[in-house]
């Protein structure tokens, strides 16, 4: 059982080591711990015996072990930390006109990677939970057409396709009406189920020639199952991990699945210190944080970095960026859902943000 003083010593060593990356000796702790150097050394030895500290080869000081970082994150790290010095910089970074959702999420990933020096990942709302709210087909020529699918009344997905050679002149209109009548208002998960169960029978009923019709359904709607994901700072991973991690980051859909499955529905923030079941992430820290995309649902923000990262700094940056990001997304969707609405981050708003009044 770790004592209160030992906990304070471990916290200080973690903070000092992540800031300087130098082993910490007992004398360096005396100003903050109300005990003699000998007592501190004795507690450091006990922490080492418990596996929370380890000796450095070139110094008499100690540094946190993997277990030490895990204990610190689980027992001492405040997940609500915000450094007000970062707020203004983050707000200014989001002061641009966005033409689509992807512009905002991409900017957030770039900013998070830049400010943390780690790998940043932003994931849109989980595909299966999104709802199909619009479907149109635009015929481009005699041989090809464009399917326009709208998710959650705001996110368009376009799929260009070749019209099957066996399609009759009326088949495209039948296809359009079937989708509008059977799929509109359903979640992507429900649509996936219907494609596998009732759609084959419906195709047999409404199409004289059924060849390629099911394939066309599958082709168009397969685009809804892909994660919208933004990954920045991949090269940075080479500084804190091996080539396996870098190669893992090169497969966005695999990354999306691994990171999404690592945080449960009832968790808002989760930090895994070398605890991932994904082999490429087993020797790194992954911080995952949920944020709201207005009118649509919950999205995810992740930081992937070294085990010895500055955790308090990382938590603060994630909190600040996610909260300002939500403000930006709120303005964006408010604009889309109004007849005429202009959005500017005024100086008064910036002052309120800096005081923390708009970040709750």
UniProtKB/Swiss-Prot annotation:
InterPro entries: GAF-like_dom_sf, HrcA, HrcA_C, WH-like_DNA-bd_sf, WH_DNA-bd_sf, WHTH_HrcA_DNA-bd, WHTH_transcript_rep_HrcA_IDD. Keywords: Repressor, Stress response, Transcription, Transcription regulation. SUPFAM superfamilies: GAF domain-like, Winged helix' DNA-binding domain. Gene3D superfamilies: 3.30.450.40, Heat-inducible transcription repressor hrca homolog, domain 3, Winged helix-like DNA-binding domain superfamily/Winged helix DNA-binding domain. It comes from the Bacteria. GO terms for molecular function: DNA binding. Pfam families: HrcA (PF01628), HrcA_DNA-bdg (PF03444). GO terms for biological process: negative regulation of DNA-templated transcription. NCBIfam families: hrcA (TIGR00331). Belongs to the HrcA family. HAMAP family: HrcA. Negative regulator of class I heat shock genes (grpE-dnaK-dnaJ and groELS operons). Prevents heat-shock induction of these operons. This is Heat-inducible transcription repressor HrcA. The lineage of its organism: Bacteria, Bacillati, Bacillota, Bacilli, Lactobacillales.
